[in-house]
Amino acid sequence: MRGVLLASIAFGLVASSAAAQDRKGIRFWNLTLYTVTTLQMSPAGKDSWGPDQCKNDRDGTVDHDERLRITGVEPGRYDVKLSDKTGRVCIVRNVEVREGAVFSIEEKQLTDCRR
């Protein structure tokens, strides 16, 4: 009986952990050097940019090492267009986005940029 109770508790913890992960949704982690002021996503190769995801943040920007909740995006591969406080506009291509996970963009990925 005790074993059944322990197994039930363990199963409940695993299930609640998975549910909590799903509730977190998709998040972006800014690992670039500068504050991101706009962030838009398009299905990879389509140049069909969605809304500015930075509007999901209280101050409308994403500081270095800050995470941002992404809305209205299904898991898949996306091109990400971002601008930062220096005026740089960059496109990072073919970024994998998974449900309940964080995707990051690092400074070294910003190779397709203009001012």
Where are these predicted regions, by residue range?
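Sec-dependent N-terminal signal peptides
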Residues: G3-V14
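Sec/Tat signal peptide C-region and signal peptidase I cleavage site
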Residues: S16-A20
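Structured interaction patches on ligand/partner-binding surfaces of diverse proteins
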Residues: Q21, S83-R114
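Structural beta-strand segments of beta-rich domains
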Residues: D22-I26, E66
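Asparagine-centered strand-capping/turn motif at beta-strand->loop junctions
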Residues: R27-Y34, P43
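Intrinsically disordered, low-complexity Pro/Gly/Ser/Thr-rich segments with frequent PxxP/GP/PP motifs
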Residues: W49-E74
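A short tyrosine-centered beta-strand micro-motif
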Residues: Y78-V80
